[in-house]
Amino acid sequence: SKAVLVASVAGYLLKDESNPDGVDASVFEGMKKDIRKDRFDFLQSFAKTFYGVGLVTSPVSQGVLDWSFVLGVMASPKATIDCVDAFAKTDFRPDFAAFTIPTLVIHGTGDKTVPIDPTGRAAANGIAGAKLIEYDGEPHGLFATVPDRLNQDLIEFLA
C-alpha cells in the first residue's frame, strides 16, 4: 500500500498561533460572504484561481472552467459555505502520525487556493518518510494543467 496527496488540504489552512503560515480567517469569511452574495459569480471566479487563469495565462480550456462551474453549482448553497469552513478549519496535522505507508505529496508552488506551506510542505514534513514533489508555479488544479507530468509521477511512485 502507498498513499498520495495531490494539492491536498492535509495540514491546516487556518492561520492561528499554532500555524503562522496559514491563511488569515478574513479570507475564508470573504469567500463565504461572496458565496452568499452571488454563488454563481463566486464559483466562476474561484475556478479561474483554482486553475491559475490570469489576464495573459489560460492553462485550461473554457470547457474545463465550465465543467468546474457545473460541479460547483450542483452543491447546495449551504454545502458550499460549509465546505469553506471544512477545508479552512479542519486541522489534519494530528492525522500525520497515522501514515505508516510510503507517501507521496505533490503540490504546486503557485497554488493560491490551498497554499503549499501550511499544507503540502507541512504534510511532507509531518508524515514520516514522505516524499514531496513541488510543481513550480502550478495552481491547485494541477491535475488539469499538467496531467501528463502528474500521471508520470503517480506511475513512478505507485509502480
Where are these regions (language model features)?
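Conserved alpha/beta-hydrolase "acid-adjacent" motif
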Residues: 112-118
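A conserved short beta-strand
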Residues: 1-14
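Catalytic active-site module of serine/aspartate enzymes centered on a nucleophile-bearing elbow/loop
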Residues: 127-159
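Residue-level signal for the nucleotide or nucleotide-sugar donor/cofactor binding architecture
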Residues: 75, 114, 145
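Conserved alpha/beta-hydrolase catalytic His-Asp/Glu region
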Residues: 14-23, 33-97
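Short beta-strand/loop motif that positions the catalytic acidic residue
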Residues: 99, 105-107, 111
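Conserved hydrophobic packing residues within short motifs/helices of P-loop NTPase cores
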Residues: 4, 104-106, 133
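Acidic beta-to-alpha connecting loop that harbors the catalytic carboxylate
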Residues: 109-112, 137-139
